[in-house]
Amino acid sequence: MADISPRMQEYYDRLNAGLAQAMEVAKTARKTGLDPETVVEIPIANDLADRVEAQVGIPGVAQMIRELEAVMSREEASLHIGDYFAEKKFGETTKEEILDHAIRTAMALLTEGVVSAPIEGIAKVAVKKNDDGSEYLAIYYAGPIRSAGGTAQALSVLVGDYVRRILGMSRYMPREEEIERYIEEIRQYNSIMSLQYLPSEREIRLIISNCPVCIDGEPTEKEEVSGHRNLERVETNTVRGGMALVIAEGLALKAPKVLKNVRKMKMDGWDWLEEMIQATAGSSSSEEKEVGIHPKDKFLRDLIGGRPVFSYPMREGGFRLVYGRSRNTGLAAAGLNPATLHILGDFLAVGTQMKIERPGKAAGISPVDSIQGPTVRLINGDVVRIHDAKRARELSSQVSHIIDVGEILISYGEFMENNHVLVPSAYCESWWRLEGGTTRPADEDEAILQCESGLYLHPDYLYLWDDLKPAEIRSLAEFIHKHGTLADKTLILPLDPTIKEYLERVLCEHQVREGMIRITPCRIVLKCLGLDSSLALSDSWEKELPESALDLVQFLSGMKMRSKAGTRIGGRMGRPGKSKPREMKPAPHVLFPVGEAGGSRRSVQEASKFSYQANTEGGNLQLEMGVRRCPACGTESYKNRCSCGTHTEPVLSCSRCGIEVQGPVCPQCGMEPTSVRQYTVNVRQMLQQAFADLGMRDRDVELVKGVKGLVSRNKPVELIEKGVIRAANKLFVFKDGTVRFDIIDMPLTHFRPREIGVSVERLRELGYLQDIYGVPLQNPDQVLELPPQDILVPEGCGDYLFSCTRFIDTLLEKVYGLPPFYNLETRSDLVGHLVIGLAPHTSAGVLARIIGFSKANVGYGHPFFHAAKRRNCFHGDTLIEIYADGILEEIPIRRFVLEHLDLSQAGVDALGTFYADPVRPAHVRSVDTGGIPHLRKITSVSVHKAPANLIQFSTSRGKNLLVTPDHAMLVWDVSYLRKIRALEVKIGDAVPVWESGVVISDRIVSIDYVPCEDERVYCLTVDRDHNVVGNGIFTGQCDGDEDCVMLLLDGLINFSRSFLPVTRGGSMDAPLVLTSRIDPTEIDKESHNLDVCATYPIEVYETALRYGNAKDVESLVDRVERRLNTPAQIEGFFFTHDTSDISAGPLETMYTQLQSMLDKLDCELSLAKRIRAVDEHDVAERVLKTHFIRDLQGNLSAFSKQKFRCTKCNTSYRRMPLAGKCKCGGNIIPTVHEGSVKKYLQMSRQICEEYNITEYTRQRIEVIDMNIESTFGEEKVEQMGLADFM
């Protein structure tokens, strides 16, 4: 990491000191032997070099990388790695080994080694023979190389060329038929998968003829080539997707980047790249490209009930784009004026996600009051611009029409990140100041004077003239000339509907009194319309007039103006996430089994009274727990500490051979041993002893909840005392032994002390000594820069963590015999304490410090803090078998998830992670722990931000699977299946696969690693067995929870890998490693596009006017990427737009306040009627087509195929038993009810009556209505008597 300033060094020293202090306490507590292990089980993460070494598994690589990076760039180092391997410094024996290690290590370095994955997508490397007998290098790429990105794909070829030169190997000399095969195969692959860039035949021929390395690949598609088959040096006739991707999206598309590295390394033999670049540039320049953008309605395609649309794509009255970043935006977060949030029905609260038209797909919403708010028409006809939240709340009930929803603040970095052209911005004060403006005019007279001095008209006094046609502007001017009067600087006009509409469209504020329109002030309006003080038309109207509206008003007024409309951005509401305690279902207090004795609540108290036989003392239970042995006295029990005071150790035995095993596998059969036994445990006595040891009485805690059974590998147990203390503090334990709170993340780079509920004095104690301008910190309104690992948590999270500190202190004092650590009296005392932040589907926690609290229900953190966390699942191309509506179909998981993402139930955070119930019932093939296949229901689908790298598994039967590093994989263990993390899978592991209609065992033969540049990864949650067939391999699912925080000491003391489940979730979402210091160079590259300047250069706005590429001005904008490897990479950030309060606006979305879907839909359509930029009829139609009809059809189908379950023991039946009761005597009930099938039927009918719905959609509703009636019969009409009306 680069050098840092003394201030930041002190900051990291504070963090490290706090971590060391907590670590010492945790180590001391663990030494007591009361936990499964006597050491802290969360290690501290190391640097990139160490991670690469761990990934490739070659000792000594880390030191080599550090030496190289000290004297050269990363790209150069990735090539020079080959020098070390060629010298066989790491034990290589063959050319294949040298080439393989060098290429994989180089790619691991190029992709920064984040999340433990080196070179995914390379199947193997081989040394082959040319026709002249010389040797050449062939690199076999697999289909998932797509996720590596074009640059990494191309550079892997360059690395291969560099190393083969060192080894004295010849270049690849292709045969003519091989070149023709490449041309045919790449074209065919494009027709199957659609390449990002399809090179021409000439380009393909040029690449293959000149590339010194043979780009080969494994078959990835079902289709075979029709010509050029059975070639001697091409091992398959099947289409090789990996090869096509590397040539098309790597070498062809990224040729300029490859050439740049070639020149830097002074490598010969690549001059042909220049020829290809020139040919491509020439062909593109000769084509006339259309300048501009078009409306994109993709964000509207999955519209559902209850989620309002705020603006249609590029529609008048929609969000007007303003470039800039506030201290609480950036990194997929956009800014809206708090007044806009209130006027839009309070549906957009702080942190609510909004699906947007451009530049990306979604953005978390933050309040920014330095941009303009909405313009509305009140019930009395007045038109008012509203720019502050207080006035918006006062007027919200009087609004009849929302003419303009206001401005939206999106940073330049978002356009860079999404590779989107810059589009014209609405004229704003930042732009005005770049063009010479200095002081905001106090009134319109001063604004006119500024224009007379040569400045552009200030944006506060601009009207949206470009929303009118020149003919309409003329009509407006002539009407005022004929019918208007002036009185005390007020223009008075008769109330004419057409004229009022014109005034509304240009956002001209006015009042309606006694049938007259009153405009005050009006001088600029009159000048723009070519009217003098007597309302006479100026001579300019008689001259030749410009054709555009904006040019016309400039011509008439003599003032320079820019467009106030700019580019309109469409948007609609996504689902807000919830910040809440993390709870399992059902939520336990302690990881201690109570079996069926605990009842449905898993009550330890109830279990302590349970007896298997009448008239016997209760509490003696038969429980399955891990076998442990005391090394001192040899006693065997389930306890972590023996009665003699010595820590016990697991006793491993082979269930097949019946022998005790010392190592990780049985020496006789090679299977992994287990450590499980049935024990008779007196739970009553244990509970009483726990209360006594804690100095508590039974009535102090009403309910302590355990678990039905342990699901970890060796089944160790937690102390019941921990559960009692948690229950007393109303806390719940997660699967790994920790207490967590889920929060929705929002970015923040600066804050004011008054916003976070912390005194100036306390902040100075934490190291905040001066504001961003270097002024000593003295008052709560100064702006302070947030360091990368300081966070704000919601107030509710603060309360929960405060309770957790009381749990930890009691635990230390009463159980471990140590002094309390926290000793807090109030929630505010949490400030300055350390926590662990963890994103779902990851295994790496990030150290953070709480420095305050957010009134909004979100967690604010530095963009680096959020970017340092990862999300993991399946690659989008993974094929899964879906059974829906009686049809079994194999489709990519990406397609299924996107088609079934029900946004009425979808969760989302600021980083764009979605998870939801599927829009209609569907099932997938799953396998239970015994290897028996079943069709299981999909209970949710999810879309996640992709991690930096992915892992590819290949089996001996030719199956391949691409997953994220923390994904759960199924492996055979003797006679049952267990789950392990993808990172823990080894070559030779037996995995279950689906082939020819049966589950069989297959072996992992290769594990490859690839950097991932895809935007998203995908997953789904499967009922009961929680696994699915992906590409023919049974594999686990992912969970879909929000990011979470836990107290540092809670994690260090109570987390144990031994508690992690084998069958559900596994080791995912567990802090297996702790990153103590964030290195900006090693985190998600999205954060590198964060702009950190105080103002944009004028070139940004000028480039946007001509729809130029964002990269055209990247060298002019101060972004994190330009600061990497300097002290400025973590401090000295600025922002272009300030905001007065990061928690302004609604704190809870109206969506969560409304209880029924009927109320939500009514509000959605009511709001659509009021917003000018929304077509309410189209909204109603879309809701029917994409939500209600799908739901009605799906539920009706599910009703006919439903199962039945017992209310007592939860046993499931395919059909109702003849006896009408369960074997246990419990009642049998259906799982799909009539009410759930009909729930949207009446609403759908009502929509068809009230809105202009197409005849086709109406008839679909009628058909569904008839189907439902034929299934359930006509609704009963209740006969009412006369008394019912009295």
From Swiss-Prot:
Matching CDD domains:
Hint
Please provide the record's keywords in A-Z order.
Autocatalytic cleavage, DNA replication, DNA-binding, DNA-directed DNA polymerase, Exonuclease, Hydrolase, Multifunctional enzyme, Nuclease, Nucleotidyltransferase, Protein splicing, Transferase
| PTM | This protein undergoes a protein self splicing that involves a post-translational excision of the intervening region (intein) followed by peptide ligation.
**MF-aspect GO terms:** DNA binding; DNA-directed DNA polymerase activity; single-stranded DNA 3'-5' DNA exonuclease activity
Reaction catalysis annotation: DNA(n) + a 2'-deoxyribonucleoside 5'-triphosphate = DNA(n+1) + diphosphate; Exonucleolytic cleavage in the 3'- to 5'-direction to yield nucleoside 5'-phosphates
Q: Where is this region: Disordered?
A: 566-586
Give the Enzyme Commission number: 2.7.7.7, 3.1.11.1
GO biological process, alphabetically ordered: DNA catabolic process; DNA-templated DNA replication; intein-mediated protein splicing
Keyword hit for Chaperone: no
For the keyword Transferase, the answer is yes
InterPro entries referenced in this protein's UniProt entry, alphabetically = Hint_dom_C, Hint_dom_N, Hint_dom_sf, Intein_C, Intein_N, PolC_DP2, PolC_DP2_cat_dom, PolC_DP2_central_dom
Q: How does it assemble?
A: Heterodimer of a large subunit and a small subunit.
Q: What's this chain's function? A: Possesses two activities: a DNA synthesis (polymerase) and an exonucleolytic activity that degrades single-stranded DNA in the 3'- to 5'-direction. Has a template-primer preference which is characteristic of a replicative DNA polymerase.
Similarity comment: Belongs to the archaeal DNA polymerase II family.
The protein's name is DNA polymerase II large subunit
The protein's organism comes out as Methanospirillum hungatei JF-1 (strain ATCC 27890 / DSM 864 / NBRC 100397 / JF-1)
